[in-house]
Amino acid sequence: MIIASAGHVDHGKTLLVKALTGVDTDALPEEKARGLTIELGFAYHDLGDGSATGFIDVPGHERFIRTMVAGVSGIDVVMFVIAADDGPMPQTAEHLAILELLGVSRGVVALSKIDRVSEARLAEVSATIRTLLAPTALRACSILPVSALQGIGIEALRGELLALQRTLPPRASHGNFRLAVDRSFLLKGAGRVVTGTVFSGQLGVGDAVWHVPEGGELRVRGMHVHNQEATHASAGQRCALNVSGVALRDVEIHRGDWMVAAAAASAARRIDVEVRVLADEPSALANRTPVHVHIGAADVTGRLVTLDGQAIAPGERVLAQLMLDRPLHTLRGDRLVLRDQSARRTVGGGVVIDPAPDMRGRTRDERRAYLAAMALPDAHVSLPTALIALPGGLDLEVFARSWNLNGDERAALLKEPTLKLCASPVLGITVARWQILEDAMLAALSAAHAAHPERLGLGERELEKALRARLLRGVFDAVLDALVSAGRVVRDGAVLRLPQHSARRSPADDALWKRVCPLLERDELKAPVVHDLASALNLNHTLLEAFLIRVAKQGLVVKVSAKRYFLPPAMTRFEQLVRALTVDGNKFTAADFRDRAGVGRNAVIEILEYFDRIGLTHRSGDLRALLDTKRRA
């Protein structure tokens, strides 16, 4: 169990932790000199059941709220300290609001400094506290009078904490390992050590772990759990990891970073959330309000953008997107706290719904439907609804990572009976949607054949456009490949047609094709420009160009520019060359392609610009990258 203190500055939190554990958690000289907690303090103690309980002592001053939030994220129980002489103070209310936003529902109120007040004052403050707690999840917690200086009530407080520990449900061990880093330091003779609270999953010595958002893969050399050397750590424990790896050479590890399993390694600058503005906020939060976002131990600035563009009234709960100034690791269900631009006031909080929103090609209605699916309580309940919400296809890898599903949990998810798998990376649609797309493709080809019997068929881009549906490319490819494999669609070079269809060329075009084709086949990678081809055939340039446009629609040639046409096998070879040049994510220049293809510079530029247009490649400066790993030229 992990217990955190909370409460206003100078109400005796550190002294109570010391009375319970024997440990003075104020370790900094400045803290001792000023009598003020500045940093998180840690202690570990057996409350009486033979197990180590972790205590996190947080600062109470308003200037250190960001540190307080880092300390109470991921805890099991709060020890809420309120001084009997002062009663509830500003940070009492703010700490209580933060605990409510973070979903902390178990705790005890330690009514401290009772040696300074009368019985009447004690009763008055207790009643005030009960009223303060009434609208919160901590409404039923005990209020125990204590004095750390005189030792009054300490054993009763210890007993209450032990009772809470005994009734605490075990932390679920499912999901991937995630540790929110709240400290990072170098230890002589050991190297880099990071500490934090384990939010989910398990980790062992020797395992790989990923530093996000900025780092890479590291190896766990050793660990301590609740201040004791250990070989494994799991959810709900305080953990120190001694890590090593090449990635440490390039980046520092800071508070707010995460140590996670590879399957959970992700970060984004946009996060879809459900947010609630505190009811006592003096005014509504405008759309695009600058905020500080606290998740785990992180504090990141950004803007709060509502889905409907409207302001959020005090007490209102809405869907919104956080547009962050730097990438942040989150997963669905992570709780967050929002503070104002100056970081002086807590204004609200909420929960992450979609940690990796990709709005490309999604309508507003699809987006809302998908968020509604992601807000459901379980991944297996969410998936069928999410598939319906996104008829263009769902990235199942992203979905599983968002829900923090480990390997076994992902495998179980893919057994959903309404799911039809499409591609790798794994995409999915519903079985019913798959059938609709098959029928739509066949109908589009049939309509094209009826409208243009002289054409061989449609190119992939034409077919995709004819469907009038926003589809992930992998979904389109999977459905089409299935139709081709089943013999229901024929792929003729770059053209798609139904098996029973053949182009009806005129006798004149047939005769001309017999003259043109041998010249294009002579050296198929070095097709002549239209002007030279017309001269070689002693044909009118305009008439030949019109002919080539017709046979391009029939799939006999591919038009890469206004003046150059290639046979489909040549374009296939050029595409294979592009893929060879971009193995393992490499990029290439026009000169690289020219040297491998053995064609002239003008032809190279025309070919590569054609590949850019159809979405096979993307140019940035002098370099090109493979953009669509499945698209065919």
Residue ranges and their predicted role:
Residues I114, T131-E281:
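Conserved catalytic-core segments of large NTP-driven translation/proteostasis enzymes
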Residues M1-V58, E62, D207:
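Conserved G1/Walker A P-loop phosphate-binding module
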Residues A52, V77, L203, A208, ...:
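Residue-level marker of beta-strand positions
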Residues D10, L16, G35, D57, ...:
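Residue-level signature of catalytic and energy-coupling elements of molecular machines
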Residues V9, L36-I38, Y44-D49, A70-G74, ...:
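Conserved catalytic network of the ASCE P-loop NTPase/AAA+ motor domain
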Residues R116-L122, T131, V246-K559, P568-H618, ...:
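C-terminal effector modules of nucleic-acid-centric enzymes and ribosome-associated factors
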Residues A52, V58-R63, V72-E124, L533:
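Conserved Switch II/interswitch segment of TRAFAC-class P-loop GTPases
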Residues H61-E62, A84-M89, V104, K113-S118, ...:
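Conserved nucleotide-binding/hydrolysis micro-motifs of P-loop NTPases
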